């Protein structure tokens, strides 16, 4: 290369890096220390997603990381209960594959629709006769039930309701179609995410921050501290 020339580099942002970790007040990071204060276990996961790289971060990887984090916490803080705090990202709120999803159902029984778990008709059901009763989400022949069957078993009259609105339901409506009506039932609304189930079954607590309030997220404080430290170092 001749003097004064520089190599032409590929355009782009370079390789992506994704870092997922848990922070706590006592240690800064969730780690397990030995007698000398050296880190022997940690919950941090680093991936390099993208073309020819690692798979993108998803719920499966998150759940595996949480399992590891719980084991580390139990070793580092025996006889203590952890409170895990998450924001409202889609991975954090992911439901299990057999979750109740009204808009994934057909109007009639069978057809191409996934099988959903059985449920209990909620105490808030409009018709008190069916409150608290178990409800199977499959027919006797093993086919997934459709919207109409599930609603009629709860005492609703669906004769004048369409299956689903197109393209979307009116924002303020709660009973514009069968799917919207069923989706507003308490057992469909109040479902537990896979993250929360994993944590509570291990004897710990889980808290999800309200949407659109990032100022409540402890990670924002960590990010601000890092930026302040970096700016101070650059100003020296």
Per-region residue spans from a language model:
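Short functional hotspots at interaction and active-site rims
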Residues: 1-236
